């Protein structure tokens, strides 16, 4: 980090020192102070800038704490970096090396930099710069103490960016009013630190917490900027507006989301009110500006040696006026992008010309006393041959960095089609085929949760982005930080990376996602792929290492906002891994990976490099925008299952597993099975037209992962397996060893195999539709299935069916448990439906693994797994009567069972995110109802004909269900990851488990003898009791109330139902011996008449006890008389 250029001139003055102060948030400020100033005076000098009282400051240089009574010159700190810490460090700290791209944050004391001359490496940023937009209400202690930080997320309507801009402006106006009040009422009480957003009439409908701070909690640059009138700031913002929109103007009217709660765009009258209030503030500020000019004009020579009070007053004025100017400038820049298209039909509303991402710079959002680390990525513009590069936003961004309003409203897309049909204002937009492609990635490197989603916005008839599956709770030990939420249409996290690509060259390779471009030459321009891959991977990977508060939503087509409450507490590192669409795919939880391989990475970068390719959505399609929120480096592993999942804009997808990608039109929902990709697919192996070669794809992913995981000790270019990666992080050596506690049973062993052979790059490739990792794993899979699946038998069709029946039948209890609490369609046997469906799917997968030997092994296997997942979802949705909420309840119930022992808030967040993504998946389901009707089984239907061997196996399975349950059911204390590894089997049936219980109950003899409402309760008790150890003879209530020591001695006591055992125990207790031999006594006691007498006596004793026991209630035990009546 380098000081501002303006400081170089003052460095020559021998009587002054240039000191760089680095704070805990990794920001560096440059101060020019007198060489004779002592440490105490220096602390007072910088106190207002760093928002830390001088008495709490600790300055550290070369490992030593600077003493207050010594002079700075004695420590030789000129031009050096001093580290500043508080006496009690804040709860959430940013690693010191995490922010490498930040520049000097403050101007010099002698003179600020001239306006507009800010280089890329010297961007100005401070904590209050963008602390105004945030979704959810934060419940934070005011005293700075923190345990878990909870986000209270309510149902937030979709917000619009113009509304966000006005809200930001109003909050900054409030801050300016506070500063003016402090200047007008000298020595008055300090203004409030933050205003509850709910009190703002503008945001009353939305529960959007907009944290506003005064300069007290702001890192205001003590060496203030040069005086600059608000009008100048406005002019600068206006002058720079055209140059700051490399990505093109935004539409006058954003496309409304499918939900009813459309964005609430503000009217021009509201804009006028805000401008009038700004005008009033400027008039109030004028007298202080005059004094500000006078003080600064004489600052170079004024002698304050005998006028300490005057110096403090002037310094206070400089700080407050400078802060007011900064807020005023931010306000003007935030408002300067608002436009009103007069060509639209009334009522007209405001829209924005460019998103805030073009202004954003790293900062720290701080509310109450807990700083929340936020980084907003810089804007990177890529240009191609033959195109005019747009101006770089970094070099021209106004100093206030208004984009610090880290929110990009529902139209966080940079380009969107105008619904009114009027041309959007601003710079003339390029032709439809050359609209910029924008990639936004929000990443948090230490959060224990992962949220990733993507939306490629296309024409109105196109389905929205297929949601990704949230992953299990992950996070490095020691981080209990705020986690993110997804509120579609109102992303609260600042965008990490914005790569704007204007007017891409026509020679770029084609990709299946963009509009067709005449003359596109697939394969052309590949010579620059190597350097481009290096640039993209290095850029994204480096920027992803910056922590960011996550809350990014998909624009337009996002699912309805149903944010969850989430909290992350420090704890052990849980390591959840999902093997992606691996051979065990059908047994994986359906929602997590329903759309794996939906979108190839070529489409992601294709959007960046330019539109081209057959099968595009047509000329009416607008520029796709991809939004990815990615918190958590460890979570990145499991987050791979969610990465880049969006709908294909072309007809059934180009990737090898066509089934997952939802077709663009309803009539295509009955798309042919994956084996026959549509006409768009031209490359061998069933792959669709790829705009980028596999080598380029792999190099980019490898580069990103290397940069991303570098902090976790991953070697550059390493192909470390997932198992090795997790074992290295956790310090355990048996996480993925077959037979270990965390990986029992067939599916656990299969997961172990995949994790030991797949690297994270392989998983990313699989999720983008590249089957090469599966192709490479063919020998190991075949050997594994032969040993663990067939038990060494020959892979004949009969043996495969028998093994499949044995395996899937063991899942019956899980299917029954999953559907025990939902309403199934009348007459549907949900258990049989799921079991037989799984048998058929897994049978085809196993047969393919055992018999396929050609080069199409991997592509077909990936296709089968994805097809099975989508059909499983469609089938269970049909069995549940089309009730998406019921299906979500089944899946979330399974998640909760697998996540016992995990932080409940994380589980709640996970289930809510799953519901959001499931809804979008189901809305664009590529499998039609006709395709799954053949799997539906009705109550009373004859059983499906099976070979004789499976029937025998079924009998043996039913007689000994315990081993299967033991292998497939996660213990209550398992981690989410272990549960995930074992949970997949039940989850696929997860679509309709409650119905299974209901249907099964009707076939059980006891079900008819109890009220219907008791059936699910009893079934649940039965399931839970089967999983616990046998209880001692005494009642649970009696034992639970007994002292532990006595309970231990009482184990096994109680009445014996067998007379021989009762007599034998009584004889031993009394020390008596039978007159005859023990065998003779046993034979006598087993005589029928003796047994009957004993039975009658036992019944009589119990009846007497029931009659005399005052605690016995016949109403509570209505069936007791059946067991102990006179007549058996």
From Swiss-Prot:
Residues 1018-1128 are annotated as: Sufficient for the delivery of client proteins to the endoplasmic reticulum. GO terms for biological process: apoptotic process; brain development; cell differentiation; chromatin organization; endoplasmic reticulum stress-induced pre-emptive quality control; ERAD pathway; immune system process; internal peptidyl-lysine acetylation. The modification Phosphothreonine is found at residues 117, 1049. Residues 87-126, 185-267, 380-435, 456-523, 555-598, 648-689, 939-1128 are annotated as: Disordered. GO terms for cellular component: BAT3 complex; cytosol; extracellular region; nucleus. Sequence repeats lie at residues 236-265, 410-438, 569-596, 602-630. InterPro entries: BAG6 (IPR021925), Bag6_BAGS (IPR048926), Ubiquitin-like_dom (IPR000626), Ubiquitin-like_domsf (IPR029071), Ubiquitin_CS (IPR019954). ATP-independent molecular chaperone preventing the aggregation of misfolded and hydrophobic patches-containing proteins. Functions as part of a cytosolic protein quality control complex, the BAG6/BAT3 complex, which maintains these client proteins in a soluble state and participates in their proper delivery to the endoplasmic reticulum or alternatively can promote their sorting to the proteasome where they undergo degradation. The BAG6/BAT3 complex is involved in the post-translational delivery of tail-anchored/type II transmembrane proteins to the endoplasmic reticulum membrane. The ubiquitin-like domain mediates interaction with the E3 ubiquitin-protein ligase RNF126 which is responsible for the BAG6-dependent ubiquitination of client proteins. SGTA also binds this domain and competes with RNF126 to antagonize client protein ubiquitination and degradation. The ubiquitin-like domain also mediates the interaction with USP13. This is Large proline-rich protein BAG6. It comes from Sus scrofa (Pig). The lineage of its organism: Eukaryota, Metazoa, Chordata, Craniata, Vertebrata.
């Amino acid at each position: 980090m380098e000081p501002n250029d303006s400081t170089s001139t003052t460095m020559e003055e021998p009587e002054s020192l240039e000191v760089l102060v680095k704070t805990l948030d990794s920001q560096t400020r440059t101060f020019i102070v007198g060489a004779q100033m002592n440490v105490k005076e220096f602390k007072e000098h910088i106190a207002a800038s760093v928002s830390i009282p001088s008495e709490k400051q600790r300055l550290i240089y070369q490992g030593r704490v600077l003493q207050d009574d010594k002079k700075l010159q004695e420590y030789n700190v000129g031009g050096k970096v001093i580290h500043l810490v508080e006496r009690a460090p804040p709860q959430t700290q940013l690693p010191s090396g995490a922010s490498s791209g930040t520049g000097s944050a403050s101007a010099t004391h002698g003179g600020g930099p001239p306006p507009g001359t800010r280089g890329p490496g010297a961007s100005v940023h401070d904590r209050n710069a963008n602390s105004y937009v945030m979704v959810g209400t934060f419940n934070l202690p005011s005293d700075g103490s923190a345990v878990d930080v909870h986000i209270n997320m309510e149902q937030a309507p979709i917000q619009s960016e113009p509304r966000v801009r006005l809200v930001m402006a109003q909050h900054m106006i409030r801050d300016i009013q506070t500063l003016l009040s402090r200047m007008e009422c000298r020595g008055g009480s300090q203004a409030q630190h933050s205003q509850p957003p709910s009190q703002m009439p503008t945001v009353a409908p939305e529960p959007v917490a907009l944290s506003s701070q005064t300069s007290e909690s702001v890192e205001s640059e003590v060496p203030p900027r040069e005086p600059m009138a608000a009008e100048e700031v406005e002019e600068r913002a206006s002058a720079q507006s055209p140059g700051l929109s490399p990505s093109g103007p935004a539409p006058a009217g954003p496309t409304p989301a499918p939900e009813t709660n459309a964005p609430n765009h503000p009217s021009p009258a509201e804009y006028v009110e805000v401008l009038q209030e700004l005008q009033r503030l400027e008039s109030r500020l004028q007298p202080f500006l005059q004094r500000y000019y006078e003080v600064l004009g004489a600052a170079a020579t004024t002698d304050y040696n005998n006028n300490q009070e005057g110096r403090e007053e002037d310094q206070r004025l400089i700080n407050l006026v400078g802060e007011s100017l900064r807020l005023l400038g931010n306000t003007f820049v935030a408002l300067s992008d608002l436009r009103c298209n007069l060509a639209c039909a009334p009522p007209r509303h405001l829209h924005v010309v460019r998103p805030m991402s073009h202004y954003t710079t790293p900062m720290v959002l701080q509310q109450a006393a807990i700083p929340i680390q936020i980084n907003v990525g810089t804007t990177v513009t890529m240009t191609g041959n033959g195109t005019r590069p747009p101006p770089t936003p970094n070099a021209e961004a106004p100093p206030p960095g208004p984009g610090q309003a880290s929110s990009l409203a529902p139209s966080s897309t940079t380009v969107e089609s105008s619904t009114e049909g009027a041309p959007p204002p601003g710079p003339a937009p390029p032709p439809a085929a050359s609209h910029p492609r924008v990639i936004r990635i929000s990443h948090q490197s230490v959060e224990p949760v992962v949220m990733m989603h993507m939306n490629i916005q296309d024409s109105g008839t196109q389905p929205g982005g297929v949601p990704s599956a949230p992953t299990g709770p992950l996070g490095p030990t020691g981080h209990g930080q705020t986690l993110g939420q997804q509120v579609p249409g109102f992303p609260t996290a600042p965008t990490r990376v914005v790569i704007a690509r204007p007017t891409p060259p026509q020679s770029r390779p084609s990709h299946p996602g963009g509009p067709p471009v005449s003359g596109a030459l697939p394969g052309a321009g590949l010579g620059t792929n190597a350097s481009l891959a290096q640039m993209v991977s290095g850029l994204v990977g480096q920027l992803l290492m910056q922590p960011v508060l996550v809350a990014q939503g998909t624009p337009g087509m996002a699912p309805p906002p149903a944010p969850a409450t989430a909290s992350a507490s420090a704890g052990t590192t849980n390591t959840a891994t999902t093997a992606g669409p691996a051979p065990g795919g059908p047994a994986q939880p359906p929602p997590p990976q329903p759309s794996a391989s939906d979108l190839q990475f070529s489409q992601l970068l294709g959007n960046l490099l330019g539109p081209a390719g057959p099968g595009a959505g047509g000329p009416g399609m607008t520029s796709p925008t991809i939004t990815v929120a990615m918190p958590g480096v460890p979570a990145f592993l499991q987050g791979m299952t969610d990465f880049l999942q969006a709908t294909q804009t072309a007809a059934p997808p180009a990737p090898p597993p066509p089934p997952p990608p939802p077709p663009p039109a309803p009539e295509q929902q009955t798309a042919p099975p994956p084996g026959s990709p549509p006409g768009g697919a031209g490359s061998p192996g069933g792959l669709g037209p790829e705009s980028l070669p596999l080598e380029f794809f792999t190099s980019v992913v490898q580069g990103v992962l290397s940069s991303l995981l570098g902090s976790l000790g991953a070697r550059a270019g390493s192909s470390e397996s997932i198992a090795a990666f997790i074992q290295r992080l956790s310090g355990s050596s048996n996480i993925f060893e077959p037979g270990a506690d965390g990986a029992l049973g067939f599916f656990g062993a299969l997961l172990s195999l995949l994790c030991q052979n797949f690297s994270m790059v392989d998983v990313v490739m699989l999720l983008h539709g590249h089957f090469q990792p599966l192709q490479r794993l063919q020998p190991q899979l075949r050997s594994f299935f032969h040993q663990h699946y067939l038990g060494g038998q020959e892979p004949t069709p009969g043996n495969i069916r028998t093994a499949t029946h044995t395996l899937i039948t063991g899942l019956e209890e899980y299917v029954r448990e999953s559907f025990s609490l939902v309403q199934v369609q009348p007459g549907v046997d949900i258990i049989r439906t799921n079991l037989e469906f799984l048998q058929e799917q897994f049978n085809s997968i196993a047969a393919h693994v055992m018999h396929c030997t050609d080069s199409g092994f991997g592509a077909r296997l990936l296709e089968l797994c994805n097809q099975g997942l989508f059909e499983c979802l469609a089938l269970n949705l049909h069995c549940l009567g089309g009730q998406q909420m019921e299906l979500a309840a089944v899946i979330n119930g399974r998640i909760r069972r697998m996540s016992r022992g995990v932080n409940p808030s994380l589980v709640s967040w996970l289930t809510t995110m799953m519901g959001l993504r499931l809804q979008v998946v189901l809305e664009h389901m590529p499998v039609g109802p006709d395709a799954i009707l053949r799997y539906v089984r009705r109550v009373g239907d004859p059983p499906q004909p099976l070979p004789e061997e499976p029937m025998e196996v079924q009998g043996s399975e039913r007689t000994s269900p315990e081993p299967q349950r033991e292998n497939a059911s996660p213990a209550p204390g398992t981690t989410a990851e272990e549960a995930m590894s074992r949970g997949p089997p039940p989850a696929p049936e997860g679509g309709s488990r409650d119905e299974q219980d209901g249907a099964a109950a009707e076939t059980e003899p006891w079900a008819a003898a109890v009220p219907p409402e008791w059936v699910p309760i009893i079934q649940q008790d039965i399931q839970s009791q089967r999983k616990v150890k046998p209880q001692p003879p005494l009642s649970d209530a009696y034992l639970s109330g007994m002292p532990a020591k006595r309970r231990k001695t009482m184990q096994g006591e109680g009445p014996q139902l067998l007379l021989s055992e009762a007599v034998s125990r009584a004889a031993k207790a009394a020390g008596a011996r039978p007159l005859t031999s023990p065998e003779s006594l046993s034979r006598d006691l087993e005589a029928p008449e003796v047994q009957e007498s004993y039975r009658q006596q036992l019944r009589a004793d119990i009846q007497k006890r029931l009659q005399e026991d005052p605690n016995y209630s016949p109403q509570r035990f209505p069936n007791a008389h059946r067991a102990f009546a006179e007549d058996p």
